[in-house]
Amino acid sequence: MSMPATSTKTTKLATSLIDEYALLGWRAMLTEVNLSPKPGLVDRINCGAHKDMALEDFHRSALAIQGWLPRFIEFGACSAEMAPEAVLHGLRPIGMACEGDMFRATAGVNTHKGSIFSLGLLCAAIGRLLQLNQPVTPTTVCSTAASFCRGLTDRELRTNNSRLTAGQRLYQQLGLTGARGEAEAGYPLVINHALPHYLTLLDQGLDPELALLDTLLLLMATNGDTNVASRGGEGGLRWLQREAQTLLQKGGIRTPTDLDYLRQFDRECIERNLSPGGSADLLILTCFLAQI
């Protein structure tokens, strides 16, 4: 797990501080997957709309990824004097190596590929901010991550070629920018919506699990989730957004009784083979940023 050659200087950050942030990332991944019931997603109750993965796969995956999060932080610190647009290139080898360990831990199952991208970006942003003695807050972390991704959507989604990736196809057909667009914009769905919503519910004394489930509904209602669109097309995405919005308008998830609505929503997502994995990734970021 050596550092890429594009690092420019040695980090001065304490190992204990780096490991603390990595632990927060691991906790965020575990919190999300253990949260139940989640419509269409793997949780403690069932495997959602997934036939190829189980809860234990996510637990093994999160542990494997935790070991790499310090590398993202260290690279963010070592590259602090580089132009932010140049950082992403150096992060890619770390992300690919982390992805390899994830696949080895899960016997080939893609459990957290989206989170490797998003958590990797945020961890690198934290490393850069710490190295530059700048405040580490949800806003500064996300804006720094955005600076790493400047031009990413243009470079990777608007390219015309005969062999379109799934992301390019969804962008051309539906205008969805997915994880790339959200990162380049500085995670506005998290910073402007999910995180303040979650923290407000906690301040009101709501049970943390209920608060997270309600926040997941908010993300599902507002996120142009490419995971959903790739499975169910535009119709599937719009249906899921409407259902989530309807539950929010009815009062959301405030009591254990409200979980019955989520269980029904889960059954319907499974029947339609829809899994809001993109919203789950954003919920992980919400959990992570709420801790820093």
Swiss-Prot record:
**Which molecular-function annotation in GO is an example for this chain?**
ATP binding
The record lists the catalysed reaction(s) as: 3'-dephospho-CoA + ATP = 2'-(5''-triphospho-alpha-D-ribosyl)-3'-dephospho-CoA + adenine
Q: List the residue ranges forming a coiled coil, or say none.
A: none
What Pfam families does its record include?
Answer: CitG (PF01874)
One BP term from GO? prosthetic group biosynthetic process
Q: Which InterPro entries match?
A: CitG, TriPribosyl-deP-CoA_syn_CitG
Task: Provide the alphabetized UniProt keywords.
Answer: ATP-binding, Nucleotide-binding, Transferase
Write the Enzyme Commission number(s) for this entry: 2.4.2.52
Family under the similarity heading: Belongs to the CitG/MdcB family.
Protein name per the record: Probable 2-(5''-triphosphoribosyl)-3'-dephosphocoenzyme-A synthase
Tell me what gene encodes this: citG
